[in-house]
């Protein structure tokens, strides 16, 4: 039997790996800490394609100020180098996949296979 993945399922697999990774990193912080609350409350922004983030400001109860989604991402990524690595990898993979740059997409998968956690390894091997 041959398994065929379509575009939707590849992106779904990638975003689940990113979500699992975010949750694992989030669990290393105290539940009342700002990093934990930021990762928990703004998870949708972290999952979103960075090119599609809005420039509109909104009041973030987590940070207690008016802020743009891009600023939320920057502040949240500053809490964890590991999260920053996976976020940037996720965004680059999304970009190459959506732009149909299969050469760069598969090169990224091969280059980072040994550097990633089990959730991303599963995606890369599929």
Residue ranges and their predicted role:
Residues 1-2, 8-15, 31-126:
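Acidic/histidine-rich catalytic cores and adjacent linkers
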Residues 15-27:
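Short, surface-exposed amphipathic charged segments that create phosphate/polyanion-binding patches used
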């Amino acid at each position: 039997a041959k398994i065929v993945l379509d575009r939707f399922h590849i992106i779904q697999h990638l975003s689940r790996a990113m979500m699992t990774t975010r949750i694992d990193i989030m669990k290393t912080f105290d539940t009342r800490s700002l990093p934990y609350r930021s990762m928990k409350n703004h998870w949708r922004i972290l999952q979103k394609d960075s090119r599609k983030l809005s420039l509109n400001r909104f009041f973030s109860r987590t940070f207690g100020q008016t802020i743009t989604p891009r600023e939320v991402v920057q502040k949240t990524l500053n809490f964890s180098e590991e999260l920053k690595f996976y976020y940037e990898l996720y965004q680059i993979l999304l970009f190459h996949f959506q732009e149909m740059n299969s050469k760069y997409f598969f090169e990224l998968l091969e280059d980072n296979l040994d550097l990633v956690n089990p959730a991303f390894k599963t995606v890369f091997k599929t």
